[in-house]
């Protein structure tokens, strides 16, 4: 299995890896769960709803299709899946996030890298801003391929860095200065909202990310960006 390592600049604390990462991320999301949705709206300037609609629209499945939302958090993406006429099931490893969930979709506490789901049993898989929190991206995409039926669709939404140097500079100011300040002020958890921007270091370059998806068993792998390149949507079809 290929693990994607994070390399923090020397001036920053090194990001955790492996089991340490999983424990740290789970504990962090348990802490911030009660305020997570409110902070999402503020940090994204309300754009997160639009991004989720784009994610679900990219599935292009028949009405009544079954869709797993991996790293579902409080269920925002599950609700968009259901509104599109699909049957959503949410999966997350954070008990705190599941306890704070507002969705009517069924939810399960499980590890997205080892799902309690039969092979080729679902039509679609989505995730929203969860990739950087998984310990092993290669294993994650292979697990998505395992549970999807042939022809099933993957759509995963994640942060990105704008290509333009000017836009990238503005993005860094917002993500690395404003977001931690907002998190410390409103969520009373500076540590969590300093980690979240830095966690983008776990993501490989876009070309490598697409290659991981293809190697896991997906065809027609594509990448779209939104909001001046600050967000990316990766899609693919199970071979």
Tell me what each language-model feature is.
Residues 1-35, 175:
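N-terminal, positively charged/glycine-rich alpha-helical extensions of SAM-dependent methyltransferases
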Residues 66-115:
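Class I SAM-dependent methyltransferase SAM/SAH-binding core
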Residues 36, 125-126:
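Hydrophobic beta-strand segment of the Class I
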Residues 113-124:
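A short acidic, Gly/Pro-enriched loop at the edge of an enzyme's catalytic core
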Residues 138-150:
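A short glycine-rich, Lys/Arg-flanked "PGG" loop and its adjoining helix->strand segment in the class I
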Residues 23, 157, 161-212, 216, ...:
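C-terminal alpha-helical "lid/dimerization" subdomain adjacent to the S-adenosyl-L-methionine
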Residues 35-38, 45-63:
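Conserved alpha-helix/loop element of class I SAM-dependent methyltransferases that forms part
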Residues 219, 225-239:
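Core SAM-dependent methyltransferase catalytic element
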